[in-house]
Amino acid sequence: MESPNMRKRLIEMESSLEVKKTATTVKQEPLETSSPLLASMISTAPNPPPTSPHALNYLTLLAAFRQFLHGYIQAGGDENLANTLGNYVAALPMPPNSLNPIGPLNAPKSPFKQQQKFHSIIKAVKREPVSEPAQNAGSGDSSVTLSSALGEDAVPQNRGSCTSMKPVPRFVMLPVVAAQSASPSASGPTSEIQQLREAAFGRYKNVLCVICNEWICSRNRKNHIEAHLNYRPYKCSACSYARRREIFVDQHIRTQHKGVEGVVMLSDVDLHVAMEVDRLAEECVTRTRKIIDTMQEKKDGDFGENKDFDEKALQMMLAEEAENKVVVIESVSQVRPKVANYHRRQRTKVLKKIYDTDVAKQTELKIVKDEEGGVPTMSIKLEEGFEINLEDLMKMVGAGSSITDSNEPGPSEIKKELAEV
């Protein structure tokens, strides 16, 4: 027999199992304004967070464009045109920031608003009052457009946008400040004498040597004077080779004494001779400038009509040489009256030489003793009897530099030079 306690326990266990089997129900309470967040969580399901679209960049746009071209060809489009566009796109270099996101493209504004804004900017340009009365001039308040400023009013403008605008004047009706009339001398061609004067102040190509009376290249006038003075400060220690520039001696040592130890370049720079070279080079420029300036004064002054120009130029040159017809060369013991150079000789023939050829051959050397110290110095006396004309000067200053002025004599010319000296 079951005891009462056992039966009581079975009843309690059965009742507890029945309670677990019954479904629990939630009593819905009315929504209150005091707890809106809790009410929304209970009554409605939570919405998923908004997902942003995939950011566009250069690579995605490039892939989309290729897909577009592929679809264009599949739709029956022109294959050649699509391939051409694809080649152009493939030729573009890769941008440095190809992965940066690309923003949306803003829609363009209406053309009517843009044109109104354009006209509002152009209205700042207005006509100024003209001193002389203009019969066909419009009102001073009329605006000026770009087409009117360019003289294109005959072209019909946009018919649908600017119908309310007033007619604008043409560009020819706008006041224009008259330019100052240039003087006849400034507008006309430069005179020959003016060209000579400009050339004498450093823009010429040839000057007259004060030693040999030949036209020499202006850029190489110092080299030419050094050749006259026989100034060769750089020498080879192994032989008698000497030149006026270091580069020639260095090249001689590398080629002729290659591999020989102890061969160096000897330097014997004389400052007195270097200063004399500079002085004589500047004297060449001074003489050329004085010749041109004196010819200008004589031509503009007392040149008569009955006398030939060459004859008067001869008189002027004789007077100029009388003032300074002896060129004193200081600090030099030996002077070469002629520097053998075939190219310069040919150029001098083309320029006709200011001095006569026979006079240039009669150039003589003489020793002039200084009265104070009694030291003999070398000088050049220029004979009188040369001719000059303006055409020769024009050819001199305008002669091209196609013929180089190489002051280094050739082998055959060195023999002639030694025979003359």
From Swiss-Prot:
Q: Where is this region: Disordered?
A: 400-421
User: In the UniProt record, which is one GO cellular component term?
Assistant: nucleus
Gene3D superfamilies assigned:
Classic Zinc Finger (3.30.160.60)
Q: Which UniProt keywords apply?
A: DNA-binding, Metal-binding, Nucleus, Repeat, Zinc, Zinc-finger
MF terms from GO for this chain are: DNA binding; zinc ion binding
Zn-finger segments (C2H2-type)? 207-228, 234-257
Q: Where in the cell is it found?
A: Nucleus
Q: What is this protein called?
A: Putative zinc finger protein R05D3.3
Q: Which organism is it from?
A: Caenorhabditis elegans
